[in-house]
Design a protein with these regions (language model features):
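Structured, acidic catalytic/metal-binding patches in enzyme active sites
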Residues: 29-247, 251
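Bacterial N-terminal signal peptides
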Residues: 9-18
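Bacterial N-terminal signal peptides that target proteins for export
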Residues: 1-10
Length: 312
């Protein structure tokens, strides 16, 4: 199960990565839906939180949705992501507080695999300012996150180029107000809330997946660029939903359900103000996704995609 893929398409984190040069390609086919009631519209845009330079410019459909939106909504308010307070909260949640090293809770085989990974990725760790020995200070979930993020950076994916960062900057430049569907503290709690068994599984799978990550992650990135909802669902959700139903519900379903009333408030607001909502692609896909949940509530929902063969 590709938990790393879920991070790229679902959860934000405090990340650092080194961008690479890439050839310009056709604009990505957008994961963009328009949800309407009698007077207002909400545009839902599925983000890939780490992208490449060649993923820009975006499609004209996305540019038009941004231009027509009076405000933007993200998973976390952009101003909070950049705050030192959120970094401090992440550090406090991630640090081990009982004075024991990480290895004390790892099975010997997993500890050995982590050591081997550290040796092979020392340069990547140095780039984010985290020497290998410092990992012993943290909880397994955070080290799993570090493993995944270092590997993504080595594969050329950059959080500073993700759709969230891009549109946060564009909104600021054009004076459009921004807000969030949840707080940074809530996102940290989703990660830190994994029980010990889930944390060890997450760390182990992060290490395993890093051995063969380039091909797998490139397939997922290509699916996002192609706007292929079926390939994205298969890559990000199918195995997770089957193997870790509690974690899937915690990371995806519960958050989607919590977001629905906030999105509906935008639709119910007086006037004719449109909103662009930018969230991880996973949250918009499948029967558990925000798109189908809003459709089930009776809203008019259509996919906005000039490059798609159908409007579904």
């Amino acid at each position: 199960m590709q938990l790393r893929n879920v991070l790229a398409g679902s959860c934000l984190a405090l990340l650092l990565a080194a961008p690479i040069r890439a050839a310009r390609a056709d604009p990505p086919v957008p994961l963009l839906w328009k949800v309407s009631d009698a007077d207002n519209s909400v545009y839902l845009l599925g983000s890939f939180h780490l992208l490449k330079p060649g993923d820009y410019p975006l499609s004209k459909d996305v540019d038009a949705a941004f231009a027509g939106a009076e405000s933007l909504v993200f998973e976390i308010p952009p101003q909070e992501i950049a705050s030192p307070e959120l970094a401090m909260q992440m550090s406090q949640a991630a640090l081990r507080t009982d004075g024991t090293p990480l290895d004390s809770v790892l099975p010997p085989e997993l500890a050995a695999r982590l050591k081997a990974w550290e040796t092979g990725h020392a340069a990547g760790l140095q780039k984010i300012g985290l020497p290998a020995q410092a990992l012993q200070m943290f909880q397994p979930w955070f080290v799993g996150l570090v493993v995944s993020m270092v590997q993504m950076a080595e594969d050329g994916l950059d959080p500073k180029l993700g759709l969230d960062q891009h549109f946060a900057g564009e909104a600021t430049a054009r004076g459009k107000p921004t807000s969030g569907l949840e707080t940074g503290a809530q996102q940290i709690a989703f990660l830190a809330g994994m029980d010990q068994a889930e944390q060890l599984q997450f760390l182990g799978e992060s290490i395993d997946e890093s051995q063969d990550s380039s091909r797998e992650l490139e397939k997922l990135h290509a699916a996002w660029r192609a706007g292929d909802i079926h390939a994205l669902w298969d890559g990000m959700a199918v195995d997770m939903k089957r193997q870790y139903p509690k974690l899937y519900a915690h990371i995806n379903v519960e958050r989607n359900d919590a977001w629905l009333p906030k999105i509906e408030q935008r639709l119910a607001a007086p006037g004719h103000d449109d909103t662009l909502v930018v969230v991880g692609a996973l949250h918009l896909l499948g029967s558990d996704g925000v798109v189908e949940k809003l459709r089930a509530k009776g809203y008019t929902v259509e996919r906005i995609c000039s490059a798609c063969r159908t409007g579904k």
